[in-house]
């Protein structure tokens, strides 16, 4: 059954527009609370609510609290905390569920609601459908004796900081390193600099002055120019860029070069292989560069592809019992350290890997150079049989590129567009293949 409200990462949209309105979020909290009560019959469920720094977080938090408590669910509020911190505390405090109020890397005018089940794992499709089924039902507040309580806890930041530090090798520290940390004026603005400082690094903080409106604004993992300039200006060894909710990572070296999620995953995997740690393999996505796949296999590391989205990477990791995965966008999963993507922990794993390899980031990543890619968006008509139109040309291009390139065709889920991506060892091969396929699709 198709979901009505939940997307691939919870419920998200523009604040003030359905579904990110206080009345809908009230119903969402109530519906989720009802499902929790049904599944947790032995005691009154307790849910943890965290948020990023968007101005709308106050409004949406209040609506969620009202909905949960009306359903008879207790609520613990942490205030601003990264998404992976909410997942960790949900698990560490043995709570029934966790909720993060954030729209990740989007502008302040958007917001969203993301749920975690018991243990800090993402909700299953089945539970999301259960919640959706109850949203449109009439709200029936519990009798006063059964209403939930809400309270704020202190020390959530400190618990999460200690957890992050515990993922770094106990025999090592970061003394001697100068780091610029860009927290995107988001959920990690307070905790991220402290983690690296307490491990011994000299830290220069930027993107650490949220005002409710400046989250992700010309800063963070989706806008690294500010960080690149700060690294050069401060003569730092590395720059660390997080996104608004703290689950993505990009890094910058001392020369101002940016390293995306694919490069950082390679560094971590190579170091684990060097240490003889069995990670099983690495899960990327259909968009992961083929050159990285080849480089990993040269290190003796297996590789497979999932659909785009950290949710699907996580599914493959769990199915295969592998430990490392992620996307070029900076979602990196180290399953032996945390059960969700975590920008701070991922950065610590990269820095630990560089110590293991006794090399800097540029040297390790020189092992492979991304194959050139050509991407073309082709507009189509509703109901157009573009697969049939491109079948013969697609087969030709794939045969020509066998072993030295690949093709990805993806229909957009939000607009009438087919995305054609061809990558190959040589840029002209990629360009020629993409143009031929795009012409075949658009010729109808």
From Swiss-Prot:
Coiled coil located at which positions? none
Q: Which reaction(s) does the protein catalyse, per the Swiss-Prot or TrEMBL entry? A: alpha-D-glucosamine 1-phosphate = D-glucosamine 6-phosphate
What keywords sit in the KW lines? Answer: Isomerase, Magnesium, Metal-binding, Phosphoprotein
Q: Does the keyword Cell membrane apply?
A: no
Cellular component aspect of the GO annotation:
cytosol
Q: Which cofactor does it need?
A: Mg(2+)
Per its UniProt record, what Gene3D superfamilies does this chain match? Alpha-D-Glucose-1,6-Bisphosphate, subunit A, domain 3 (3.40.120.10), Alpha-D-phosphohexomutase, C-terminal domain (3.30.310.50)
Question: Which positions in this protein are listed as binding Mg(2+)?
Answer: 104, 243, 245, 247
Cite a single Pfam family from the UniProt record: PGM_PMM_II
The UniProt record lists the EC number as 5.4.2.10
Q: Known NCBIfam families for this protein?
A: glmM, PRK10887.1
Q: What does this protein do?
A: Catalyzes the conversion of glucosamine-6-phosphate to glucosamine-1-phosphate.
UniProt lists the family membership as follows: Belongs to the phosphohexose mutase family.
Q: What is the name listed in the Swiss-Prot or TrEMBL entry for this protein?
A: Phosphoglucosamine mutase
Organism for this UniProt entry = Neisseria meningitidis serogroup C (strain 053442)
The taxonomy runs:
Bacteria, Pseudomonadati, Pseudomonadota, Betaproteobacteria, Neisseriales
């Amino acid at each position: 059954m198709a979901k009505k409200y939940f997307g691939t990462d919870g419920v998200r949209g523009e604040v003030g527009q359905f579904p990110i309105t206080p009345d809908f979020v009230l119903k969402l909290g109530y519906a989720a609370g009802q499902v929790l009560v049904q599944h947790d019959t032995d005691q009154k469920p307790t849910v943890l609510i965290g948020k990023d720094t968007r101005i709308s977080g106050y409004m949406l938090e209040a609506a969620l609290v009202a909905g949960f408590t009306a359903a008879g669910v207790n609520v613990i509020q942490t205030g601003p905390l990264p998404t992976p911190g909410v997942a960790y505390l949900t698990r560490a405090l043995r709570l029934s569920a966790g909720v993060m109020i954030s729209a990740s890397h989007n502008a302040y005018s958007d917001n969203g609601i993301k749920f975690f089940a018991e243990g800090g794992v993402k909700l299953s499709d089945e539970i999301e459908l259960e919640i959706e089924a109850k949203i449109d039902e009439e709200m029936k507040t519990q009798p006063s004796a059964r209403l939930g309580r809400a309270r704020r806890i202190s020390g959530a930041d400190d618990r999460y900081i200690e957890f992050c530090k515990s993922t770094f090798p106990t025999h090592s520290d970061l003394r001697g390193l100068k780091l610029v940390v860009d927290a995107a004026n988001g959920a990690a603005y307070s905790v991220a600099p402290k983690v690296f400082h307490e491990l011994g690094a000299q830290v220069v903080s930027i993107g650490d002055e949220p005002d409710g409106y400046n989250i992700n604004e010309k800063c963070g993992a989706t806008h690294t120019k500010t960080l690149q300039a700060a690294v050069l200006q401060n003569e730092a060894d590395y720059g660390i860029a997080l996104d608004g909710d703290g689950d993505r990572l990009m890094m910058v070296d001392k020369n101002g070069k940016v390293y995306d999620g694919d490069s950082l995953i390679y560094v971590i995997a190579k170091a684990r292989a060097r240490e003889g740690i069995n990670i099983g393999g690495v899960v990327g996505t259909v968009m992961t560069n083929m050159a990285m796949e080849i480089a990993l296999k040269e290190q003796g590391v297996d590789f497979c592809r999932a659909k785009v989205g950290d949710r699907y990477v996580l599914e493959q990791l769990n199915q295969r019992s592998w430990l490392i995965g992620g996307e070029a966008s900076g979602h990196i999963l180290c399953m032996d350290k945390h059960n969700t993507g975590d920008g701070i922990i991922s950065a610590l794993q990269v820095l630990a890997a560089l110590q293991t390899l006794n090399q800097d980031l540029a040297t390790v990543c020189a092992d492979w150079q991304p194959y050139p890619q050509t991407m073309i968006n082709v507009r189509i008509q509703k109901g157009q049989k573009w697969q049939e139109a491109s079948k013969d040309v697609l087969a030709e291009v794939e045969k020509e590129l066998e072993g030295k390139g690949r093709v990805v065709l993806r229909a957009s889920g939000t607009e009438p567009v087919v995305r054609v991506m061809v990558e190959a060892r040589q840029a002209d091969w990629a360009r020629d293949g993409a143009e031929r396929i795009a012409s075949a699709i658009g010729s109808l």
